[in-house]
Amino acid sequence: AQAGPSRAYERLGLPLGKYLGAIAVFRVTLVFAWYSSVVGWTLRYIFAPLDAAFWKDPAAFFSSVASGWQSALFAVITIVLTGLIVMFGIRKGIEPVVKYMMIALFGILIILVLRAVTLPGAIEGLRFYLIPDFSKLTPRVVLTAMAQAFFSCSLAGAPMVVYGSYLRKTDDTPVSAITTAFGDTTVAILAGFAIFPIALTFGISPKAGAGLLFVSLPHAFKQMIGGFFFATLFFILAFFAGLTSTVSMLEVSTEALLQYTNMSRKQAVALLVTIISLLAIPIALYGVIWNYARYFVLYSGPLVAILPPIALYWVYGAERALAEINNGAAIKLGKWFIYWGKYVYPAGILAAYLYNILG
């Protein structure tokens, strides 16, 4: 369809496609307003090792960063930085910046992994990470993992629709998809090699969630030789990872404005940065707006996720969709992919999202 969600669903013939696509765009915009706070924390933490309070009491330091003016300030800085990247478009802005960030991300991650696996208690962390306990493999774990994969790779999400619109007809779509999944999974696996040995070496629960990142790991860095250096690298890594997500979110909203208004890219980005900042500030300061918006984000998830496979495989036609996918592919996908796209893929999406909502 060579377009963002609203225009793409229209072109594919999905009834009310323009408005259903608008829901997807609005949802991503709300998520960005909230997520900018989290990414903003990682930006603030890049400079945290310079502050004595960070080392003295990590929990109190995180509390001061995660609420109040610091949270709002760094959320807005994150939004502005994201806007500056998106303002230059895919080819001149997003593509080169993300490419260099990914190179830096891999480099930093490898340094952290090498340090983590050479810690005295690293073997316990590696054992926890690599030896499976199949008694814990419940349906909930599987579906939660699926939901995480959908979010991480933006499967059935508006960002993937937008990024996919920039593919040329002759591009190898299957190879692009496999490369994306492989790269994402590789980073996730390497991150596990970096985090779990550190956590287990210093007696930190690997189930600590956000507290693991912002409270427990600083305790560990404090006890490590070169802790200042590795703490700084770690949070640069976390910020780069978060920024790649915010860039994709803002590009979705920007593309929608460009499709349906006469705005230039710079005007569209400037308007969106202003609006999202105005949403992000009260969210960061008081949690307002998000207390209500999160219900829309949660319950609209299955609808937004199921739209691409319905539009592509059911409305546009599975045979035609397969022909488009195979156009330019070195290795063609077989007829089996039709059944995957029409039945297995949508069922997996709905199961993961609905289980998380009902659970």
Locations of the language-model features?
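Loop-to-transmembrane helix boundary motifs in multi-pass membrane proteins
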Residues: 68-73, 183-191, 228-231, 240-243, ...
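Membrane-helix boundary/coupling elements in multi-pass transport proteins
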Residues: 27-40, 157-164, 180, 209, ...
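Juxtamembrane transmembrane-helix boundary signature
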Residues: 1-14, 36, 198-205, 311-318
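Inter-helical loop and helix-membrane interface segments of multi-pass membrane transporters/permeases
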Residues: 5-23, 36-91, 120-143, 208-214, ...
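Helix-loop-helix connectors at the membrane interface of multi-pass transporters/channels
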Residues: 39-66, 166-170, 175, 179-187, ...
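C-terminal membrane-solvent junction of multi-pass transporters and transport-like membrane proteins
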Residues: 20-25, 67, 260-273, 295-357
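Membrane-embedded translocation segments of transport machinery
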Residues: 95, 99-243, 267-268
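Transmembrane helix-loop boundary segments of multi-pass membrane transporters
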Residues: 1, 7-14, 23, 41, ...
